[in-house]
């Protein structure tokens, strides 16, 4: 019965992809171990190569045992297993969020190397209920309260085929088939708000969780049927994103959309332009929406971005000064800099560094820069935007600023594209 439910889910979620490969994230807990066995049956039935991935966060001694166990299962199932390691660098600030981001970075990068398009994760019905309660507690809007069984990360499709299966069914499946799993002791700690909510829900009657699930489904339906199409339409109609890493929002077109969608558009642009992975809080977006409604020009900094109104348009570009991007050595053919730009070299060069333009360097090359095109596109905000662009240096000398076709020598040839590592449950643009 459980497998039939799983099979129906995954076939609907995968659709007509015509997959020959698929990957699965396994931690050693009951949820992911059950998913592994279910996915293995499905993969065998459909002649699909299954890759098993685990990530050691190097925080618990037990994780080594879990990884050995997953490797043992993988060997028995004759599946390829990859054990990845997350380096927390002894920085325990905001660790849960950083570990999650690091985990997905590692897994999706491996998927790209393996030419795998889909990664399965073991989020089940109880997880969705807990998430809904957590977000409700944080006063999330309707987009925040919604959940998705499919989303994208690093151009890999993340699929959750256990979304309507309670944890109790997964545990029962493992017990019936005498399959071992590990309990993560951190799930018992009241240090995490999720665990407290989980314990409260455990004490409630089943109908309470059922009612929450119904509300979740209603929210999801509203998003899918009405608000998500409106959001995609709004982005297409009102937003212009430029290769220089800034954007203009047409406020006349923006005004016709619902408030929920307006919040999401601003959030969408702030994440993309800032290069950050986290969303802006509603309390930081609300004042911007209020200023927009007042029809006055303004200039504000929010979420690592400068937002300025110019008549009926909103210009958003990256804020520089407080948090400068790290320099990167261009060792391979291409590199991502500032989580926003992809720089590619088209010739062999000595080790060069991708960094930002300093005032000292600007003074040296100022008279050689042609900023007319950038000036026209950005409504005379070219000087501020120039300092947000990647430059290429060799031995402390600026040899190229590809965006404005500045090269100190004809032998250099670099390509640059605006390619933010943008993550959204509602939109995806490759």
Curated annotation (Swiss-Prot):
It is an enzyme of class 6 (ligase). Pfam families: ATP_bind_3. Its main location: cytoplasm. GO terms for biological process: tRNA modification. Keywords: ATP-binding, Cytoplasm, Ligase, Nucleotide-binding, tRNA processing. Its EC number is 6.3.4.19. The keyword tRNA-binding does not apply. The N-terminal region contains the highly conserved SGGXDS motif, predicted to be a P-loop motif involved in ATP binding. Ligates lysine onto the cytidine present at position 34 of the AUA codon-specific tRNA(Ile) that contains the anticodon CAU, in an ATP-dependent manner. Cytidine is converted to lysidine, thus changing the amino acid specificity of the tRNA from methionine to isoleucine. This is tRNA(Ile)-lysidine synthase. The gene is tilS.
């Amino acid at each position: 019965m459980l497998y039939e439910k799983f099979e129906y889910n995954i076939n609907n979620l995968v659709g007509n992809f015509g997959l020959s490969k698929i990957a699965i994230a396994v931690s050693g807990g009951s949820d992911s171990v059950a998913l592994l066995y279910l996915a293995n049956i499905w993969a065998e039935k459909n002649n699909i190569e299954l890759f098993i991935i685990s990530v050691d966060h190097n925080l618990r001694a037990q994780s080594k045992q879990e990884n050995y166990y997953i490797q043992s299962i993988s060997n028995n199932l004759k599946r390829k297993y990859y054990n990845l390691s997350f380096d927390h660098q002894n920085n325990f600030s905001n660790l849960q969020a950083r570990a999650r981001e690091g985990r997905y970075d590692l897994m999706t990068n491996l998927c790209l190397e393996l030419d795998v398009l889909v990664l399965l994760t073991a989020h089940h019905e109880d997880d969705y209920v807990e998430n809904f309660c957590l977000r409700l507690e944080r006063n999330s809007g309707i987009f925040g309260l919604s959940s998705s069984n499919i989303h994208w990360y690093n151009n890999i499709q993340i699929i959750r085929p256990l979304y309507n299966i309670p944890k109790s069914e997964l545990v029962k499946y493992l017990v019936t088939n005498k399959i071992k799993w590990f309990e993560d002791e951190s799930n018992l700690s009241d240090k995490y708000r999720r665990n407290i909510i989980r314990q409260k829900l455990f004490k409630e009657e089943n109908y309470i969780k059922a009612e929450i699930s119904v509300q979740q489904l209603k929210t999801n339906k509203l998003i899918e049927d009405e608000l998500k199409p409106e959001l995609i339409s709004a982005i297409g109609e009102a937003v212009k994103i430029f290769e220089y890493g800034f954007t203009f929002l047409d406020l006349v077109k923006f005004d016709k959309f619902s408030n929920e969608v307006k919040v999401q558009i601003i959030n969408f642009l702030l994440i993309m332009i800032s290069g950050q992975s986290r969303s802006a809080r509603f309390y930081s977006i609300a004042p911007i929406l209020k200023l927009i409604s007042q029809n006055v020009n303004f200039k504000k900094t929010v979420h690592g971005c400068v937002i300025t109104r110019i008549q009926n348009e909103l210009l958003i570009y990256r804020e520089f000064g407080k948090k400068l991007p790290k320099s990167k050595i261009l060792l391979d053919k291409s590199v991502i800099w500032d989580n926003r730009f992809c720089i590619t070299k088209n010739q062999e060069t000595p080790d060069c560094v991708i960094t930002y333009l300093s005032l000292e360097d600007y003074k040296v090359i100022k008279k050689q820069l042609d900023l007319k095109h950038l000036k026209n596109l950005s409504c005379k905000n070219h000087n501020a935007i120039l300092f947000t662009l990647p430059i290429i240096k060799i031995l402390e000398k600026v040899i190229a600023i590809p965006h404005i076709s500045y090269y100190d020598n004809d032998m250099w040839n670099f390509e640059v594209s605006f390619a933010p590592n943008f993550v959204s449950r509602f939109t995806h643009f490759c």
